[in-house]
Each structure stands twice: as C-alpha cells, then as structure tokens.
C-alpha cells in the first residue's frame, strides 16, 4: 500500500508538471541559455576582460617604470652624495691650504713688520745717541763757558786767561 501511494503521488506530480518536464520547452530554454551566454560573452565579458587586461597591463607597465625611476633616483642620489663627499673633501683641502697660505703670509708680514720696527728702533736709538752727543757737546761748551764765567767772577778776568 505504501508503494501504491508513492506511485500515485509520482503520477500526480508528473501530470501537473514537475521540476523537469521533458517537453519542447527544455531544448528552447537550453537554446535561450546558450544564446544569452553567447551574447553576454560578446557584449559584456570579452570587453570587460579586455578592459581589465589592459588596465592590468597599464598598472604593470607603470610599476615597472616606477621601479626603474626609483632605481635611477637612488642611483642619482648615491652619485650626488659621492660627489658631495668628494667636493667636501676637496673644499677641506682647499681651506687647509688657504689657511696655511694665510698663516704663511701673516708670518711673513709679521716678520717684515718686526724687521721694520727693529730698523726704526735702531734708527731712533742712533738718533737719540746723536742728539745725546750733541747735547753733551753743547753742555760741555756751556760748562766751559760757565766755568770761565764763574772763575772770572771769583778770581777776576785777568787771572783766568
């Protein structure tokens, strides 16, 4: 009896139309599905795929270019840093040389100035010595003259000569 109920239930379902009715609509639905898939492929999926592929290629190319630019920028930065270090070393050498030259020039000028000062000091000492001798000679003359005057006053003018 249970078997009979199942058979009757299946027959009723088959008569009313079930999930898969095998009739002319099934191949029509399959053809519609294939046609829709074909149209979507031509109109939507291929252009979308091409757009996605071209965008991916564009991004990939830009990434490669960016990596190249970054590598070039790093290389240039390293090169500039090396050149800057070399320039700094050269400038330090030039500064040291200039300082040495300036010290040499200053030492030479100081030596020349000291020699000039020594010469002027010696000239001044000679001048002072000459003036001293002249003053002493004048004083001797004055002393001689004053001594005679004193003697003349004390002894009289007749005895002094």
Curated annotation (Swiss-Prot):
Keywords: ATP synthesis, CF(0), Hydrogen ion transport, Ion transport, Membrane, Thylakoid, Transmembrane, Transmembrane helix, Transport. It is a single-pass membrane protein. It holds the Pfam family ATP-synt_B. GO terms for cellular component: plasma membrane-derived thylakoid membrane; proton-transporting ATP synthase complex. The chain crosses the membrane at residues 26-45. F-type ATPases have 2 components, F(1) - the catalytic core - and F(0) - the membrane proton channel. F(1) has five subunits: alpha(3), beta(3), gamma(1), delta(1), epsilon(1). F(0) has four main subunits: a(1), b(1), b'(1) and c(10-14). The alpha and beta chains form an alternating ring which encloses part of the gamma chain. F(1) is attached to F(0) by a central stalk formed by the gamma and epsilon chains, while a peripheral stalk is formed by the delta, b and b' chains. This is ATP synthase subunit b'.
